[in-house]
Amino acid sequence: MAKKPVVIGVAGGSGSGKTSVARAIYDHFGDRSILVLEQDFYYKDQSHLPFEERLKTNYDHPLAFDNDLLIEHVHKLLRYEPIDKPVYDYTLHTRSNQVIHVEPRDVIILEGILVLEDERLRNLMDIKVYVDTDPDLRIIRRLIRDIKERGRTFDSVIDQYLSVVRPMHNQFVEPTKRYADVIIPEGGQNVVAIDLMVAKIRTVLEQKSVL
């Protein structure tokens, strides 16, 4: 039996440390063995909408994501076929014309706030992880990220958090914790949890390899 890639889902609230967990696991295996698919790259294309309408996008709702495309790409990677990952432009609030070519790897990490929300995605995962972090720390991290990386203002980030992010987290993100095989507090700073994850991934890889 030919080997098959291992798929790991890493979910959690905005600013919880999902990216840090994915990066910590990535560092253990290296770019020849592992790849990361960020759900943030798979927001739906909105180029057909006026800019004023795009500004109203609720990025924390499950319907904001193009999970059909993400699932299609995961299936290709499971067959060891390359994909062209979309790029999302947060300043224009729509998908960019650019893509990122991604070669298949033995380990696929699906990282995003709602990767555990869609049953179709969960069914593709060998290991499901939820990163659990204090809400105060999450909002601080989101402030820093959105102001620095997405050109947002302090007031706009706070307004969005109170009106959208927090209620969406409570309604959609937090409930997906029940699907997790592993719950990691403190994100990528939890060295013990990361080491256990790496050991588990190696075990699953061995089980999926040719005996």
Swiss-Prot record:
One of its GO terms (cellular component) is cytoplasm. The keyword Cell cycle does not apply. It catalyses: uridine + ATP = UMP + ADP + H(+); cytidine + ATP = CMP + ADP + H(+). It is found in: Cytoplasm. Transmembrane segments: none annotated. It holds the Pfam family PRK. SUPFAM superfamilies: P-loop containing nucleoside triphosphate hydrolases (SSF52540). Pathway: Pyrimidine metabolism; CTP biosynthesis via salvage pathway; CTP from cytidine: step 1/3; Pyrimidine metabolism; UMP biosynthesis via salvage pathway; UMP from uridine: step 1/1. One of its GO terms (molecular function) is ATP binding. Its EC number is 2.7.1.48. ATP binds at residues 12-19. Keywords: ATP-binding, Cytoplasm, Kinase, Nucleotide-binding, Transferase. GO terms for biological process: CTP salvage; UMP salvage. InterPro entries: P-loop_NTPase, PRK/URK, Uridine_kinase, Uridine_kinase-like. It is an enzyme of class 2 (transferase). Belongs to the uridine kinase family. This is Uridine kinase. It comes from Geobacillus thermodenitrificans (strain NG80-2).
